[in-house]
Amino acid sequence: MKIGFFSPENIPIVYHLRKLIEKLTGHRFQNGCGMTEGLLARSEEFLTENVSHISLKGNATPDRVLAKARELVVRRGCRIFVFDPLNRFDHEPAPGQTETQYISNLLNKFTEFATQYNCLLILVAHPRKMNRNPTTGATPRVEMYDINGSADFYNKADYGIVVERDKEIGITRVYVDKVKFKHLAWAAWQLSSTTRQRAVSPLRRISRPCRPAGATCPEHRL
């Protein structure tokens, strides 16, 4: 499945490609981490064939980005798009339009694009500032309703995933906050920055699939 990125924070693109190669292979570029010339060459060939980037001169408005995405659908056959992050778009709300109204219309526009071209559109958005509990000092877990700007980020999404990095203990947690068709899956990933090991745990159950008595439920993974 071919993918297109609009990711201004990963410019120059060569740096983004480096990140993608490390994720694709599971090996870092440092000496002794297993990255070989052959593995690098195969990875570069795969990315050249399957990954495209949207780069624009001037204002990167949602309409301009979507126009480039349409070109990638037609010319390259892209069916997955990642817009990362939302706050790097050049937004142009109409006069008198509130932030909530603007975001609602914008999400409708993204949804219509994904539906029309049968694409998966992944939108990365940042939460509002989360205040620590004055008594415990703990920061509450971010949920989709905490995304800065509008509750429609939860209401209008088909799927919602929250990535939480706990730098104090070196753990990254991935919560599935919403699945529109709840029979599909539930899961929560936890990744240790020290051991690089993943663990699946029911940190947030999305659904309990119906199954015959005595049947086992296979593990669902992201």
Map each language-model feature to its residues.
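Cytosolic-facing regulatory segments adjacent to core modules
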Residues: M1-G77, A188-Q190
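Structural recognition of the conserved hydrophobic beta-strand(s) that form the central parallel beta-sheet
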Residues: F5, V82-F83, C119-H126
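Cofactor-binding loop segments of dinucleotide-utilizing enzymes, especially the Rossmann-like FAD-
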Residues: P8, H126, R165
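Flexible loop/turn segments at secondary-structure boundaries
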Residues: I11-H16, K23, R88-E92, K129-R132, ...
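Amphipathic alpha-helical segments in well-structured domains
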Residues: I13, I103-L107, D146-S150
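Conserved, well-folded catalytic cores of nucleic-acid-processing
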Residues: K23-H27, P85-E92, F113-Q116, V124, ...
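Phosphate-binding/switch loop-helix module in NTP-utilizing enzymes
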Residues: S52-Q116
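C-terminal regions of RecA-like/P-loop NTPase motor modules
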Residues: D63-C78, E112-Y117, K129-L222
